[in-house]
Structure formats: C-alpha cells, structure tokens
Amino acid sequence: MPMQGAQRRLLGSLNSTPTATPNLGLAANHTGAPCLEVSIPDGLFLSLGLVSLVENVLVVAAIAKNRNLHSPMYCFICCLALSDLLVSGSNMLEMAVILLLEAGALATRASVVQQLQNTIDVLTCSSMLCSLCFLGAIAVDRYVSIFYALRYHSIVTLPRARRAIAAIWVASVLSSTLFIAYCDHAAVLLCLVVFFLAMLVLMAVLYVHMLARACQHAQGITRLHKRQLPAHQGFGLRGAATLTILLGIFFLCWGPFFLHLMLVVLCPQHLTCSCIFKNFKVFLTLIICNTIIDPLIYAFRSQELCRTLREVLLCSW
C-alpha cells in the first residue's frame, strides 16, 4: 500500500487519497476543480477513539463481572463491545504510528512498517466485520425472544451462542485476511458492500417486524381496557421513532465507508468520486462515533448492567 506523503493511512488499500489538512475548505482535484474536503484533526480522532475504548472496556468488564449477565443476549452485547473496542483501538494505534513516523520518533525499517501495517489492517477489518455481524446477531436474538418467547431458552442456548460467536470471529479474521491479500480486486470490495447491505436489510426487516408485533400487542391491550385509539397511535409513533433512530444511526455511521468502497470499484477516476475519496478519514470517524453510540443503545439501557458498571467504577477507586 503506497505512502501518502508524510502521513500514511495503514488502511491505504481502501484509501487512495492523501490525509486531509486540519481545516474545512475547498481542495482541488487533479483537474483544478474545487472539492469539499472535511478534515478531522488528529486530536479529535484520537479523543473519540479513547472515549470509545474506555466506554466499551467498561461494558466488557461489567458483563464479565456479573454472572447474571452471562446469558446469550449479553454475550452478544459483550462481543459487540469487544469488536467496537478493537475498531477504535486499531484506528488509534494506526494514528499513533502515523504521528510517531511523522515526528521522526519512530525509526524502523520499511519491512517492519509493512508488517505492522498488514497486521493493523487485518485487525481493523476483522473487528469491523465482527461489529456488523454482532449487530445482526443482537437483532436476531431479540426477534427470537419476541416471536418465539416460550421456546426462546431452548432455541438460543448458551452453547449455541458461544458456537455462533466463535464462528463469527473465525470467519471475520479469515475473510479480512483474504481481503487484505486481494484488496486490489474489485470483487472483494463489492463483497464487503453486499455484506453491509445484507446486514442493513436483515436489521430493517427484523426490527420492522418486531415493531409491527409490538403495535398489535399494544392495540390488543387498549381494546381490552377499552381505551381510545390515540394511545395506541402514540405508542406506534414512539416505536417508529426509536426504529428510525436505530437504523438511521447504523446507516449514517457505516454507509459512507461502504459507499467509498463501492465508488472505488465503480468510478476510481471520476472527478466527483475523487472528491469523495478525499474525505476517507471522515468516514472512519463516523465508524468510531458508532462504536461510541452502540453501548448507549444496546448496553447502558440495562439496569442490571448499569448497576454492575457502578460497582466496577467504585471498585476501581
């Protein structure tokens, strides 16, 4: 993967553009036409990564500490936090190496840097794939708990959850290794885009179906108690708003990154696409933001987990 001036992206296989300068302005492409280039300062990028790192470490520690949280659902949430932790940690490591190389504080041979680059690439890609997979696994788990409530504990057992988790990690590591090895092939990038779209469709279908079932249940309760219809409509609106936020955050945080991959395949030399490529670091930052938001959506809404988290924090003091 090529050098990108003084700063080089260790995900250079995905980013064919130089790192942005610390401002927001119009940068010229190779034809001199202006391009909107949004720069993310290194300090902000590292700060967001640190927040994500601390947040997800706390989630993993809380789930590991409390045996009541060793259920399949919390195992998936723990693995989501762990994969998000690796996403933010690998990007922070990448940025730290870039800054050290740029400052001349890290002097090493090119072969060593290349090996480190490949290692971080595999770690980053596998953790991203794991994060997407566990978001889908959580959606499936919630779907089964609602539509097969009486059989849930016989369907989603802890051994099955552990096997699914192991399969996700192994498949993610193997596929990311192949991705790094064959990153110049368009089919590889398209497979990643298709995978993202499949996860998006899966989550949308499952959560919309769950919302429809919840609305039917609420409607049945209102009829039983002879209440007015607006109460049910209010519940439906709240559920729709929650669903929109959930899927909207997922799409807004992950979509630009996979749009970048798709454009690398479809229009690598097009002027408009080249302008989009200049904002690659913004797309990575959005993914880091998603790793910060995930615990707020999936973990911290649990009273049991929050109580354990307070115990962990008190013990650390």
From Swiss-Prot:
Q: Which SMART domains match?
A: 7TM_GPCR_Srsx
Segments traversing the membrane: 38-63, 73-93, 119-140, 164-183, 192-211, 241-266, 280-300
Give the InterPro entries listed for this entry.
Answer: GPCR_Rhodpsn, GPCR_Rhodpsn_7TM, Melcrt_ACTH_rcpt, MSH_rcpt
Write down the glycosylated positions.
29
Q: Which residues lie on this side of the membrane: Extracellular?
A: 1-37, 94-118, 184-191, 267-279
Q: Which GO terms describe its cellular component?
A: plasma membrane
Question: Key word Transmembrane present in the record?
Answer: yes
Which superkingdom is the protein from? Eukaryota
Q: Which biological process terms from the Gene Ontology are attached to this UniProt entry?
A: adenylate cyclase-activating G protein-coupled receptor signaling pathway
| Sites of S-palmitoyl cysteine lipidation | 315
According to the UniProt topology, which residue ranges lie Cytoplasmic?
A: 64-72, 141-163, 212-240, 301-317
Q: How does it sit in the bilayer? A: Multi-pass membrane protein
Subcellular compartments: Cell membrane
Q: Pfam family of this protein, just one?
A: 7tm_1
Kindly state the subunit structure of this protein.
Answer: Interacts with MGRN1, but does not undergo MGRN1-mediated ubiquitination; this interaction competes with GNAS-binding and thus inhibits agonist-induced cAMP production. Interacts with OPN3; the interaction results in a decrease in MC1R-mediated cAMP signaling and ultimately a decrease in melanin production in melanocytes.
Q: What does this protein do?
A: Receptor for MSH (alpha, beta and gamma) and ACTH. The activity of this receptor is mediated by G proteins which activate adenylate cyclase. Mediates melanogenesis, the production of eumelanin (black/brown) and phaeomelanin (red/yellow), via regulation of cAMP signaling in melanocytes.
Show the PANTHER family listed in the entry: G-PROTEIN COUPLED RECEPTOR
Similarity section: Belongs to the G-protein coupled receptor 1 family.
- Can you say what this protein is called? Melanocyte-stimulating hormone receptor
The beginning of the lineage is:
Eukaryota, Metazoa, Chordata, Craniata, Vertebrata
